[in-house]
Design a protein with these regions (language model features):
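Bacterial N-terminal signal peptides that target proteins for export
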Residues: 1-8
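N-terminal signal peptide c-region/cleavage motif recognized by signal peptidases
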Residues: 16-18
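Structured, acidic catalytic/metal-binding patches in enzyme active sites
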Residues: 22-226, 266, 272-281
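A cross-kingdom marker for long, charged
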Residues: 221, 225-282
Length: 282
């Protein structure tokens, strides 16, 4: 179904949850004990190099429960350096309760959806002001210039991802899209309609771990590939600093497969994995 392919791709780009089929996913959904209950979770993957330095790939979902962001804020206090994702000028550092909505269309949409789902928006919960935080992303002007050079828009990226998803699903004889018309109608007729719709959305986002997105397509998408290159450049600079022994790359889950490939090429080896609950639906 082409509609569900476009629908799914839109969600995954919007909430930064595209991943790849792999042994260690960066986002997952666990069903709960009751109807319309479950947990959407993101991973922290830890790696070490031959010098004993620790690198953490901290996956994020940009709208989530307040407790999720509170746990991340506490974790970041333990790090020597946090390289963070944010399309903004390097000197723009949101703090909790700053009422920053984000200047990009994606951020504005995410903020609106957060309100509708009764969850929090990342830029209003994560504290980016500590001295150990360092910007590792494009500026709005840089992002706009690169997308213009590629004649790229959010809509064209959605279509590219949707086509890739549909081809992947067909190659594995799987039905494209988990959200069917019947499940949507059931959610709309539920006594707790809001929770039911949130459950369906969380399940779709968690399904990202089973998607097969071609690495070449990922590299070519400005929202993924070009921004990942900026993050990796910042990481390489940080690794040259002798006092940075615990480093976190804090990026949306969509970016993590590409970042992990380079991290492994740099000589880091996987050492640990933990999960945080972004949405507790109950």
């Amino acid at each position: 179904m082409k509609f569900f392919a476009v629908y799914s791709a839109s969600l995954l780009l919007l909430f930064s949850c595209i991943s790849h089929a792999q042994d260690a996913p960066f986002v997952r959904f666990n069903d709960g004990p009751g109807e319309w209950q479950g947990q959407l979770q993101t991973a922290i993957h830890s790696y070490r190099d031959s010098n004993g330095r620790e690198l953490n790939l901290v996956s994020a979902i940009h709208i989530a429960d307040a407790e999720y962001y509170s746990l991340l804020n506490e974790f970041f206090k333990t790090q020597d350096l946090v390289l963070y994702e944010l399309v903004a000028e390097p000197d723009q550092r949101p703090g909790p309760e700053s009422n920053v909505a984000g200047s990009s269309p994606l951020s504005l949409i995410q903020n609106l959806v957060a309100r509708a789902l009764d969850v929090e928006f990342q830029l209003q919960q994560i504290d980016y002001t500590p001295a150990n935080f360092r910007h590792a992303d494009l500026s709005p002007a840089e992002l706009g210039r690169i997308m213009a050079e590629k004649d790229e828009s959010f809509f064209t990226m959605v279509l590219d991802v949707a086509i890739a998803q549909q081809a992947s699903a067909q190659s594995r004889n799987q039905q494209q899209g988990e959200v069917s018309i019947s499940s949507l109608l059931m959610a709309l007729s539920s006594e707790n309609q809001s929770q039911a719709l949130k459950y369906l959305l969380a399940r779709e986002l968690g399904r990202a771990e089973s998607l097969l997105l071609d690495p070449q397509l990922e590299e070519n998408l400005t929202l993924l590939g070009d921004r990942n290159r900026v993050a990796i450049a910042a990481l390489i600079d940080a690794l040259a600093e002798t006092d940075k022994n615990a480093i976190s790359l804090f990026y949306g889950a969509a970016h993590m497969p590409g970042l992990e490939r380079v991290v492994l090429e740099l000589g880091f080896k996987a050492s640990d994995q933990s999960w945080l609950t972004a949405w507790a639906i109950q």
